[in-house]
Amino acid sequence: MNYLKEDTIAALSTAAGKSAIAVIRLSGENSFQIIGKIFKTHSKPEQQVKHGYITDGIEKKDEVLCTFFKAPHTYTGENLVEIAAHGNPVIINEILNLLYKNGARPAGPGEFTYRAFLNDKMNLAEAEAVCALITSKTEMSAKAALNSLSGEFSSKIKNIRDAVTNLIASMEANLDHPDEDNMFLSRSEKLSRFDSCIKDVQNLLNSYKTGKILQYGIKVVIIGKPNAGKSSLLNAILGKNRAIVTDIAGTTTDTVEETIDCCGIPLIITDTAGIREHSENLIEILGQAKTREAVCKADILIWLFDSSSEPDCNDAKIADFLKKSDLNIPIICVLNKSDLPPLFSSSLLNRENKVKVKISAKTGVGIADLLDEIVKIAGVSESKNDYLMINTRHFILLQNTLESLIRTKQSLSAKDADEIACFEALSAQISLNEILGINVKQDILDTIFSTFCIGK
């Protein structure tokens, strides 16, 4: 990613397509000069928001409002202009082309936020939170991302980093002046403080699972024999007819995926083709192969049974498939068609020893109980509002930090190992700094910002 900081960049910052208003962002040292070439206004020079027209010098292209932000008090830390234009793609392209012709260049993915990072307007963890906030799927995930963007996660990292840095300084001073031991922290005090740092890191690591769930959602796959009511269950959960439902076995021949907000958790629910003992239909066979593929990617499995009939060879085949798959995920056994006389024998379920929920996809009875069970398994409480968005990069670096701190403590406990303890503590400090974006390799930065949308 070859982002030249000296360039002035421009891009559409609002969603593409027709809308009432679209915002074009222009950032860089020459932003004011470039916009001055195509923006004509009668507003007073001291006004920050100015009304006028975009023109190519011959004719007007649009009536707009331009907001001027002077460096360094801007999102990027540079001179920045936001053009509020009418949201017609034809007009937007004309304005962008005029900006490019007059000295700006198209911004790359996340380049505005990248410049904010380079200009110390935010650290790397906060920049990543910007992307997480934009892509949030639920209100709770947006709150978690905003908490991180507001600096709550960074503050915790800085506190641990500063504590480690102070301990390193004490250890280095101790090594330089071994005869003045009484002037520095005692060994027991150092061990106690490292213990505190370890606990703080462990608490953040424990937040990773929740952050991952809020950011990416939970994949819930519905599996069962043909006509168990899988598609009806999907429709009942969604509250609309998304999947085709008939009395003909094998109606669903492909996976159908939908996402819902369940108590703040994004649930990615997949309806699958039914698995049965014998099938000569090629399309159905291919559908069953996709079912097996979806099961292997699931976070939670809903195994659906028809409670109005006895378990048969198809149920047994699914049980055998799950056993051979050796899945290490929660499986919820759901007895569907509770509105009909029960004929289902629980012997198969007793052997499986899984959570059991009774529902009727037709009437909606038990659907809320099923969703409650999924939320319970996820372990995310909607009443909490202090969640943080900790991503995989942070998790790996926090793990590295934890391992380094544990080795530091072990070395401090041993005799004549102070230099090793100091080295390990420095490793922890480096990992913590990387989370904040200090001394991070360019290829890592390129990877992070390439996931952003253009215009942010």
UniProtKB/Swiss-Prot annotation:
Per UniProt, (6S)-5-formyl-5,6,7,8-tetrahydrofolate binds at 25, 82, 121, 456
- Look up and give the organism this protein is from: Endomicrobium trichonymphae
Q: Which gene name belongs to this protein?
A: mnmE
Keywords per UniProt: Cytoplasm, GTP-binding, Hydrolase, Magnesium, Metal-binding, Nucleotide-binding, Potassium, tRNA processing
tRNA-binding listed as a keyword: no
Q: How is the cofactor bound?
A: Binds 1 potassium ion per subunit.
Binding residues annotated for GTP, in chain numbering: 227-232, 246-252, 271-274
Q: What does this protein do?
A: Exhibits a very high intrinsic GTPase hydrolysis rate. Involved in the addition of a carboxymethylaminomethyl (cmnm) group at the wobble position (U34) of certain tRNAs, forming tRNA-cmnm(5)s(2)U34.
What are the BP-aspect GO terms?
A: tRNA methylation; tRNA wobble uridine modification
A Pfam family? MMR_HSR1
Family matches, as InterPro entries: G_TrmE, GTP-bd, GTP-bd_TrmE_N, GTPase_MnmE, MnmE_dom2, MnmE_helical, P-loop_NTPase, Small_GTP-bd
List the protein's name.
tRNA modification GTPase MnmE
Names of the cofactor(s): K(+)
Write down the superkingdom of origin.
Bacteria
The family database entries (HAMAP family) matched by this protein are listed as: GTPase_MnmE
- Which positions bind K(+)? 227, 246, 248, 251
